[in-house]
């Protein structure tokens, strides 16, 4: 079955926009009638992805971040896209506690949190070409599965 609804949002990569973006994504997912816990999980994962883009992708240079969201039946999909410096070693970057900015007191837990709160997380990136974090979460139970 195809996508039943989509939303895209583009904004400046500024820390003051992180809260706006996570609330916009939360508002979009409400059409699936998620639990408060599911909404909190999504907001946390999106927040981590946006923060990674701002700090690591752009190093606080306020270029654009795009978020694409979609719902299909009871599944929620969100992509957080930046056009920053990219990730040279995705596997290493996704290791818990790995950080490229230890002097900034970064814990290196962003991807670990995304993986903990979402059902699937996949990262696409090339150095100097940006990064796409694809995330998916199943919301509740698909009542159509029993028909």
Per-region residue spans from a language model:
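Conserved short strand/loop->alpha-helix "switch" segment adjacent to the catalytic nucleotide/phosphoryl-transfer site
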Residues: 22-47, 106
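Short, charged, low-hydrophobicity "junction" segments
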Residues: 20-23, 69
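STAS-typified acidic loop motif
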Residues: 8-20
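Conserved beta-strand-loop-beta-strand hairpin that lines the nucleotide-binding pocket
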Residues: 1-8, 53-147
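Conserved polar catalytic motif of the HATPase_c/GHKL fold
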Residues: 48-52
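A short, mixed-charge helix-start or loop-turn motif at secondary-structure junctions
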Residues: 6-10, 32-35
């Amino acid at each position: 079955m195809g996508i039943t609804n989509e939303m895209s949002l583009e904004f400046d990569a500024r820390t003051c926009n992180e809260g706006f973006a996570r609330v916009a994504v939360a508002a979009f997912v409400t059409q699936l009638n998620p639990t408060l816990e599911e909404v909190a999980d999504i907001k946390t994962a999106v927040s981590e992805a946006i923060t990674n883009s701002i700090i690591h992708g752009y190093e606080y240079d306020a270029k654009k971040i795009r978020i694409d969201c979609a719902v299909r039946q009871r599944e929620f999909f969100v992509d957080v896209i930046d056009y920053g410096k990219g990730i040279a070693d995705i596997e290493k970057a996704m290791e818990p506690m790995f950080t490229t900015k230890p002097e900034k007191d970064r814990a290196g837990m962003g991807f670990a949190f995304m993986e903990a709160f979402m059902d699937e997380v996949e990262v696409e990136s090339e150095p100097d070409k940006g990064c796409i974090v694809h995330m998916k979460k199943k919301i509740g139970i698909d009542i159509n599965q029993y028909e």
